Amino acid sequence: MKKFMTATMMVAVLAAGGASLPAAEAAGVFFADAPVVSSATTAPVATPGTRPAIYIPGQITTPYIDRDLTTDENMFFLAIEKADYNTMQLMLDKGVDINAYYSVKDTTPLGRAMRMNNRTTIQFLLERGADVQGYVFDRGENHTHSYLVAAADKGDLALVQYLHNWGADINGLSWSYGYGFYNALFTLGTSSDDLNVMRYLIAQGINVNYVTSNGGTTPLIYFAQMYISAGDRQNILKMLLDAGADPAVRDASGKTAVDYCIARNDLDSARFLQTYVRQ
């Protein structure tokens, strides 16, 4: 990955009017080349349970703007898209809410920067008070969108690390119609990028026994259900088991991860789960 701050970016923005760019290092936090996390990394010991409690976040409070945007708000979002830091700062100075969820845009300012994957804009907004946790997009149901979960969904280890270093909860939750509330593990697949993200999340203490609010799926069940090779499945299952995942947990239909391995005709993985002994 290229260095977060480049000389060409700085020259271009300064030439545009001398706006204050995000510092190369913000409170000791900056984008850098993300190291590959060794597969030998061990995670903190998790406490297994038959039905872990579902954690629904309450720490995120988001101003909700359900109307047409003002001229200043429209200009602010356009400035985010154009990476115009002078205009962004001007609109903030005029009172545009940096943390509001704007229903017309279906996101927050930081959410828009995340979707555009503009690292300079992400840091610019965080340095000016954007909430690194995420936002609530349904006030009645407290449905949340975690920026860290979104970064994991991209398989972007550098962004996951960056947001976590800024203070994003490693156990932050997003909500979807399928799973209800879910953590970052439920966004991952079998690619090398995803596995590196998984190793980092586990090493930082993510709840490997999290139960989704719809269906009662655990990470073990999630990967047991996935259409992947037996070798890939066992590799991931071992990572989760080594971190304390409990194979005895049943979902809302009463099935365990072993049952889903059998449903995928993966006898080797089913036997692996039944005979696993943690070292």
Model-predicted segments: where are they?
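Ankyrin repeat A-helix N-terminal signature
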Residues: 78-83, 111-118, 150-156, 183-194, ...
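N-terminal segments that cap or nucleate solenoid repeat domains
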Residues: 44-105
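Ankyrin repeat domain, specifically the short helix-to-loop turn at the C-terminus of the second helix
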Residues: 89-97, 123-131, 161-169, 199-207, ...
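Leucine-rich solenoid repeat scaffolds
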Residues: 247-279
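Ankyrin-repeat boundary/"N-cap" motif
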Residues: 68-78, 101-111, 135-150, 173-188, ...
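Positively charged n-region of N-terminal signal peptides that target proteins for export
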Residues: 1-4
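C-terminal segment of classical bacterial N-terminal signal peptides
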Residues: 15-23
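Hydrophobic helical h-region of N-terminal Sec-dependent signal peptides
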Residues: 6-14
